[in-house]
Amino acid sequence: MAITNEQVERINELARKKKAEGLSEAELEEQALLRRAYLDSVKANFRSQVETIKVIDEKTGEDVTPDKLKEIQRKNGMRD
């Protein structure tokens, strides 16, 4: 799930308000949900990037991608 710019702006707005005057219970809950969505999005993007990496030994030119990563790539149709 991608997070929108509006959601990031709202996270920042709530953070500023929390510092300045505090948040209501509803705002604290909203902030927690938005932060969780943001972290989930970052983790998913990071995982997606890592799962497409192919590691090559500089000296030999051999594929030295870890077996666990190769298996994930096969499962996702990115390897033979």
UniProtKB/Swiss-Prot annotation:
User: This chain belongs to which protein, by name?
Assistant: UPF0291 protein YlaC
Q: Which family does it belong to?
A: Belongs to the UPF0291 family.
Instruction: Please state the protein's primary subcellular location.
Output: cytoplasm
Q: Which GO terms describe its cellular component?
A: cytoplasm
Q: Which PANTHER family match?
A: UPF0291 PROTEIN CBO2609/CLC_2481 (PTHR37300), UPF0291 PROTEIN YNZC (PTHR37300:SF1)
Q: Which gene encodes it?
A: ylcA
Q: Which InterPro entries does the entry mention? A: DUF896
**UniProt keyword terms in alphabetical order:** Cytoplasm
This chain's source organism reads Lactococcus lactis subsp. lactis (strain IL1403) (Streptococcus lactis)
Query: Which locations, inside or outside the cell, does it occupy?
Result: Cytoplasm
Q: Which domain of life is it from?
A: Bacteria
